[in-house]
Every structure is written in structure tokens, then in C-alpha cells.
Amino acid sequence: LGPGATNLTTPAAYAALGAFPLVIITGQKPIKTSKQAQFQIVDVVSLFTPLCKASTQIVNGNRIPSLVREGFRLAQEERPGAVLLELPEDIAEEQTVEPVIPPHDRRYAVAGDAALDEAARRILAAQRPLLLIGAGANRRRASKALRKFVSDTGFPFFDTQMGKGVVDEDSELYLG
């Protein structure tokens, strides 16, 4: 509640900088009626707005399933990052008639054969090709293919902070 949520600013910033999906669900004092006035109430939604892809207070119990699902979707989609959902005590206690939303399949855009062939043609025609390896390269299927690509082509490469370790940095092709 309130002040305790401030301890999550560092993980939220880290998720934003590192493109890591993170869903933060914080509590809050009741918003409809409160006997404690504003004691220990911090505007968590505003605090997290610059750090998160979305920062929302849930104000209706029927919206909990859809907002949680949307929070997870938004946190994972390109570019991943943090999403904050603030759930006040009185809203959390509301009865809801909304059904639980089943998980959905995640689909990534994949370039067609013609686009891949054209990209390969341009890369192979380059006079001094250089690879920049970033965060997207650390996906399971991409990293293995990228290591093979570097090995097969002999192209020099460097990486961003989030691309480190995808291809062996001890390689003579690594530029730092």
C-alpha cells in the first residue's frame, strides 16, 4: 500500500531501460470511502507514469480481468517494459460478474520469404558489413540462428547492453 509501492520504482525503471516485461500490481487504501482521510496515500499512478508503459488505477471490480490481461499484453509487446495496476482495497473486494479471460497466443511478425531474400542479397552485397546485436537477438530461436549467421558469414559484430552474450564475445569478430 501507498509508501511501500515506492520500493518498486527501481525495478520499473530497470524494466523500462532493459526492455523486460514486468507487471506491477499494487494495493491502495479504499477510494470510495476512507476513514483515514489521506494518511499514507501516495499517488502511485502518477509516480510510476514516467517509468511504465501504462500506469492505471482500477476503479471498477468488473474491469479487473480485462485490465490485468491488457497489462500483461502491453508489458510483453514490443518494446517490453513495466505496467502498473493499482488496486484499491474496496475495489478488490467487489463481486464481479466478468469471467476469467483465457490466455491468448502470442504471435510475432515474421518477414516473408521475399523480404528475407532481399535482406540477404543486400547484406551479402555490402562492402563492409557490420552487425549490431541488440535485445531482440536474445530470443530463444533468434540467438541460435544469429550465432550460426555470424559463424557462416564471418561478419564482425558489436552488441548493445541487452544483446551481450548472444554471440561469444571472445570471438575474433567481436568489436566490443
Regions found by a protein language model. Give the residues of each.
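N-terminal alpha/beta PP-like core and its mobile active-site loop of ThDP/TPP-dependent enzymes
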Residues: 1-176
